[in-house]
């Protein structure tokens, strides 16, 4: 799939060091030493999540032998979504996908500036460090993990936690947009707004 530009109804995203890079992968399993990446997508937003630009979405070719090692859940989920067929038909390698994604992201944010953003993103980062190490170094060492807020909300405000229902599409681009929507939900319903600064006062140093 090719990259999708920002919609005509919203302003174009301007290159800025505060922009956020959202990422999601689908893998054949959970172990980066034995499993492989089969799909990857990115979305860039501004810092307030108001503007979003979709990057390329790649199904990564893997051998039939690799696909055969998937457990029943992965075979069922990725078969139902059509991803397994896309992986078999793809000619894109992990290295080729990483290079194109990095070139796309460089239009919107400098290397080393954006945390890696998503849900349970450290798992994606483990696979990236194993199979796309140069691309992994494009990101800041910090992560912006929506699942942190999810776990806190589940314990501290269970009623609010239950208010966001995930669709569980298990396709990379759909999962990214769901993560962004989930963070917006927690910002509105769970996070405490910053106190307004009175006229003439300065905000405290970070």
Swiss-Prot record:
<feature type="domain" description="Exonuclease">
    <location>
        <begin position="20"/>
        <end position="183"/>
    </location>
</feature>
<protein>
    <recommendedName>
        <fullName>Oligoribonuclease</fullName>
        <ecNumber>3.1.15.-</ecNumber>
    </recommendedName>
</protein>
<dbReference type="GO" id="GO:0003676">
    <property type="term" value="F:nucleic acid binding"/>
</dbReference>
<dbReference type="InterPro" id="IPR013520">
    <property type="entry name" value="Exonuclease_RNaseT/DNA_pol3"/>
</dbReference>
<dbReference type="Pfam" id="PF00929">
    <property type="entry name" value="RNase_T"/>
</dbReference>
<dbReference type="InterPro" id="IPR036397">
    <property type="entry name" value="RNaseH_sf"/>
</dbReference>
<dbReference type="GO" id="GO:0000175">
    <property type="term" value="F:3'-5'-RNA exonuclease activity"/>
</dbReference>
<dbReference type="GO" id="GO:0006259">
    <property type="term" value="P:DNA metabolic process"/>
</dbReference>
<dbReference type="GO" id="GO:0005737">
    <property type="term" value="C:cytoplasm"/>
</dbReference>
<keyword id="KW-0269">Exonuclease</keyword>
<keyword id="KW-0963">Cytoplasm</keyword>
<comment type="function">
    <text>3'-to-5' exoribonuclease specific for small oligoribonucleotides.</text>
</comment>
<feature type="active site">
    <location>
        <position position="141"/>
    </location>
</feature>
<comment type="similarity">
    <text>Belongs to the oligoribonuclease family.</text>
</comment>
<keyword id="KW-0540">Nuclease</keyword>
<keyword id="KW-0378">Hydrolase</keyword>
<dbReference type="InterPro" id="IPR012337">
    <property type="entry name" value="RNaseH-like_sf"/>
</dbReference>
<dbReference type="InterPro" id="IPR022894">
    <property type="entry name" value="Oligoribonuclease"/>
</dbReference>
